[in-house]
């Protein structure tokens, strides 16, 4: 599972991904794309 820092989400800073509508900078996303229905773990 990619770390949030490994995700480059369109429209988001390159060091962040979006999990469940929240930009997270730590932990992991369950879905690599960081979709809105994803969760930070």
Swiss-Prot record:
A motif (Cell attachment site) lies at residues 33-35. GO terms for biological process: cell adhesion; regulation of blood coagulation. Potent inhibitor of fibrinogen interaction with platelet receptors expressed on glycoprotein IIb-IIIa complex. May prevent blood from clotting during either feeding and/or storage of ingested blood. Belongs to the ornatin family. It comes from the Eukaryota. Keywords: Cell adhesion, Secreted. Pfam families: Ornatin. InterPro entries: Ornatin. GO terms for cellular component: extracellular region. Coiled coil: none annotated. This is Ornatin-A3. Its main location: secreted. It comes from Placobdella ornata. It is found in: Secreted.
